[in-house]
Structures are given as structure tokens and as C-alpha cells.
């Protein structure tokens, strides 16, 4: 049961919906069908999700008129979960959505993000946002020795500013520094990249794909 305040005109709902990959997905979907306000759907690209049929996923979301936008979020390993999904697998899954023949009746946020990155309008660094932890401290996303994400707590805003200033050199490898998308790629938080064998969390492969597709369309329309 939703609080009546959620049904006011200036509200919209953000719903995590991973289809059958998450418990009680049928109940979540039924609630989405009954929602009188717009819904922004977030899908976590877990191993179960990326194995699903994309055309069927789009068809089901199209059937829910309240869904106005859909974003596929990459899975990042942490202390609680360690699913095996590579960055390259995430890229390939998003490409399936981009190439799907079923028309989307909703806004596909990932497409917008790709366009913003290619236009160098997206800031990939953490200098424009900061988290507040349950302990009342400032928080930034860091990665431990096993490359699992965690929140690093900072006592003061000055400490956060110092951390953000050091991020481009401390958290970014030579692979990142030599990349043409550096500073504007699709990463939510920079992490150390050793090589591009399985892609990177800036999703260079996805940006390369989109740029090539754009050039191909331009040539075919010339």
C-alpha cells in the first residue's frame, strides 16, 4: 500500500523491477499496472536478467502505460554479492536493447546517457555529487583490494573535496588516461582498469559501438 502523498501530481515513482530474477516480481508488476503516476523503471543487469529475451521484456514494459522511462543499471560486486557479470556482457545486453525490433513506448535512459557521453556533456568524476551515510558522514564510493565496492566515510566536506580532486590520478589507470572518453565515459565511479579484455566500467565498447552506428547512419543517409 502506497502513502496517498505519492499520488500527488508532482510525484513520480522509481521502481526496481528485474522481472523473474527477483522475488515477488508478479506482485511488483501488478502494482505498476495499477499506478496512477508515472514510473521510472530500474533494471539491474544480473546474470539472470541478461539471459532473458529482450523483445519479451520490452513488450511487457510496453503493456504498462505508467512506465515512462527504463534504465538498465550495471551490476557491481560488493561485500554482499559477487555475481559474475563482466562489463562486456553488460555492453552486449544494452546493445540488444538498442537493436531490438520491438518499438519502445518509454524513454530508454541508457540511450540518452550514451549520447551525453559522446557529446562530452557527462561528468564521469565524483566532483559533482556526494553521499551522506547513515552515520551522518560524507561518503564516496571506493573499491577494496578485491575490487569490491564500499562506501568510504569522510568526516568533513573539505575531506570530500580533497578526495574528489585526487580521484583522476588516484583511481584512474593509464588505460583510462589514454582513452578518448576519459572524463566523459559512462562510469558512475572510476575504478582501476588493468586491461580491456572484458571491457571496463566506463563501457568504452558501448561508446565505440554507438559512435560507429552513428557514422554508419550518416553515411547511409548521405
Locate the predicted segments by residue.
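Acidic carboxylate-rich catalytic motifs and surrounding loops in phosphoryl-/glycosyl-chemistry enzymes
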Residues: 44, 109, 188-191
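A short, structural micro-pattern
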Residues: 7-9, 124, 173
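Radical SAM/AdoMet-radical enzyme domain recognition
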Residues: 1-77
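Short acidic, gly/pro-rich beta-turn/loop elements at beta-sheet edges
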Residues: 25, 51, 80-82, 189, ...
Amino acid at each position: 500500500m502506497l502513502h496517498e502523498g505519492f499520488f500527488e501530481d508532482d510525484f513520480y515513482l522509481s521502481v526496481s523491477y528485474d522481472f523473474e530474477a527477483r522475488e515477488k516480481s508478479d506482485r511488483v508488476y501488478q502494482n505498476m499496472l495499477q499506478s496512477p503516476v508515472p514510473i521510472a523503471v530500474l533494471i539491474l543487469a544480473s546474470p539472470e536478467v541478461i539471459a532473458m529475451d529482450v523483445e519479451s521484456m520490452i513488450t511487457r514494459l510496453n503493456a504498462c502505460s505508467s512506465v515512462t522511462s527504463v534504465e538498465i543499471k550495471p551490476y557491481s560486486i560488493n561485500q554482499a554479492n559477487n555475481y559474475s557479470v563482466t562489463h562486456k556482457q553488460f555492453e552486449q545486453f544494452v546493445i540488444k536493447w538498442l537493436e531490438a525490433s520491438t518499438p519502445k513506448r518509454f524513454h530508454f535512459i541508457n540511450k540518452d546517457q550514451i549520447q551525453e557521453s559522446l557529446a562530452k556533456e557527462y561528468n564521469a568524476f565524483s566532483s559533482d555529487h556526494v553521499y551522506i551515510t547513515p552515520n551522518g558522514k560524507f561518503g564516496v564510493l571506493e573499491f577494496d583490494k578485491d575490487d569490491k565496492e564500499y562506501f568510504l566515510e569522510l568526516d568533513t566536506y573539505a575531506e570530500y573535496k580533497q578526495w574528489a580532486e585526487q580521484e583522476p590520478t588516484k583511481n584512474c589507470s593509464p588505460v583510462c588516461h589514454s582513452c578518448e572518453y576519459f572524463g566523459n565515459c559512462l562510469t558512475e565511479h572510476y575504478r582501476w582498469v588493468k586491461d580491456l579484455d572484458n571491457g571496463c566500467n566506463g563501457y568504452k565498447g558501448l561508446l565505440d559501438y554507438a559512435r560507429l552506428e552513428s557514422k554508419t547512419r550518416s553515411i547511409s543517409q548521405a
